[in-house]
Amino acid sequence: MHARLGRQILAMAALAMGAAALFATATAQAQQFTMKISSPTVADATAEWAKVFKAGVEARSKGKIKVEYYPGSQLGQIPATVDGVAMGTIEMSIPAVGFLIGLEPRFQVFDAPGLFDSMVHGEKVLGDPDIRKRFADLGAGKGIEPLTIFINGPQMIVSHKAIHGPADFRDQKIRVPGAAPMYVEPFRKLGASPLSIPLGEVLPALQNHTIDGAVAAIAVLTAFKYYDIAKPMTYLPGTFLVAAGIVNRAWMKSLGPELEAIVREESIKAESVYSNWGVDDAKRAADTWQQKGGQVITMAPDQAKQYLADVTSVMPPILAANPQVKADHDALVAAAKKYR
């Protein structure tokens, strides 16, 4: 009798252990990850990318990954969210690349003037397999990497005084999207005083005349209604705002191979919005600006040529200061020629 009772107890223990193992496996398989995405912009191509990305990831992961998108700097200003990704408190942030140089100086290369002819041309260059591979590990030493690098839109300058050519920049205090020489020196060459200011702080600075003008993507300026503060907005020749969606590398690995692959694949799929929806949105933004009483200025050909000559003239010493950035720039120039 005692032997039979012992066998029953052992059998029950084995069943319990098996059930516990099954429960642990099921729990691991059902584990849900939350991917918080921070963006400083609203109602632009970044938001459209996030919408497509969210739908694809949540559907393919069968609910194992929940994507939460926070536009308009809801999770904090750009420097704080970039630090948050590096520390692992935020899974993803999508700033202009100029705000990532503190983590990885190579990010500045994307903002070299004259690289891209149009948004579509720029997306072809950034989507080139060799270019993707070259920049896949940017920031790895600081625990981040770019999940997506894209053209947010044409770079514009909104200003209290209309900008029709290089001479109009002289003595103007201009907000630029980054503090590195790549952003600062071109405007110094034009006689301006460039200041790096996070996007969330630019509107009040322009309103109270702390700055005379601000450089940003066209859709951003329209979405935040800058036309209520300053009417003239000028296309900067051969210049586009490049942004990057950086993710925490440790978090990506924590997903496991299958879910990590889903995130990467859906990010690339969603990039199609930049070449279609994003291009159309840039046109809509210009139309809206004019409808709201703003002025959209395109420099005359001779002025545009002089502008590019001035701003590109400062590039050689900047590139020479960092051999890796110089090599990256050469690779982008070669890819740009390939897709012309």
List each language-model region with its residue ranges.
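Intrinsically disordered, low-complexity segments enriched in small/polar residues
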Residues: R4, A16-A19, S61, Q291-K292
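Bacterial N-terminal signal peptides
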Residues: A11-A24
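N-terminal secretory signal peptides that target proteins for export/translocation
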Residues: M1-R7
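An acidic, glycine-rich surface segment that forms the CoA-thioester-binding/catalytic face
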Residues: L126
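Boundary at the C-terminal end of the N-terminal hydrophobic targeting segment
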Residues: F23-A24, A28-Q32
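N-terminal secretory/targeting leader peptides
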Residues: Q31-G122, D130-R340
